[in-house]
A protein has these predicted regions:
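A generic secondary-structure signal
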Residues: 35-39, 83-88, 142, 201, ...
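Residues at the starts of beta-strands that form the adenosine-phosphate
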Residues: 3, 94-96
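Catalytic His-Asp segment of secreted/periplasmic serine-dependent ester chemistry enzymes
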Residues: 105-207
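Conserved SGNH/GDSL esterase-like catalytic core that processes O-acyl groups on lipids
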Residues: 1-75, 79
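Residue-level recognition of beta-strand->loop/alpha-helix junctions
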Residues: 6-8, 101, 153-155
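Conserved N-terminal glycine/acidic-rich loop preference
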Residues: 44-62, 68-89, 98-99, 103-151
Length: 207
């Protein structure tokens, strides 16, 4: 098996550098990569690197829609992530790099589900969720394409259509709404079952 080295950080960003007025203190993927290299945990013996980043860039104070355009954000993401991934590949040439996509956080339209309790979901009109979700999905897809990496498109796999996201009534769903009675650690993120699903999909892609 593979030995796990975890350099992830809650709130990590792809391209927005840390700043004193950050909504949540964070580092960047590139900083995580450099830390792993400095610790000699990322090298020619590394076989697998998984990366998930993009959502946390969207709400940083200096990256809001009033201050940036979508083409600017797309370009900044691509430059930062391709740089970080190519850095990984330069020191770990034997590693497979997998970009982990995010689940669909909507009901398939412009609503997100604020609560999912006792089989009843509430649908909140929140078009920015769908807008940014599509943006991040395309950013990740292009970064994988431009670096010859794998992209796990989880919007396609965990959605209301598949019956597995936070808007779904399946008690074994993989995504949690903000107020959710399925077992999970953080609102609006993966459920315990969702973490297991991601793990299985990573293993399948690695093989």
């Amino acid at each position: 098996g593979l030995r796990l080295e975890d350099y992830s950080c809650p709130g990590a960003t792809a391209y927005v550098e840390p700043h004193g007025n950050d909504a949540i203190p964070h580092d960047t993927v590139r900083q995580q990569v450099e830390r792993a290299i400095a610790d000699r945990k990322l090298d020619a013996n590394t076989r697998l690197v998984t990366i998930s980043a993009g959502v946390n860039d969207t709400y940083q104070p200096n990256n809001l829609p009033s201050m940036t355009t979508q083409p600017q954000r797309m370009a900044r993401y691509d430059a930062a992530m391709t740089g970080a991934i190519n850095r990984v590949k330069s020191v770990a040439p034997n590693a497979k790099v997998i970009l982990l996509g995010i689940p669909d956080e909507t009901d398939g339209h412009n609503h997100t589900c604020g609560s999912n309790l006792l089989g009843v979901t509430s649908h909140w009109y929140f078009p920015l969720v769908a807008y940014y979700q599509d943006e991040v999905r395309e950013q990740q897809r292009l970064a994988a394409l431009h670096t010859g990496s794998e992209f796990l498109d989880m919007v396609a796999e965990i959605s209301v259509q598949s019956g597995k996201n936070g808007c779904s009534n399946d008690p074994g769903r993989y995504g949690a709404s903000i107020f959710d009675d399925s077992p999970h650690k953080l609102a609006g993120h993966l459920t315990d079952a969702g973490h297991g699903y991601y793990g299985r999909r990573i293993a399948e892609t690695y093989r």
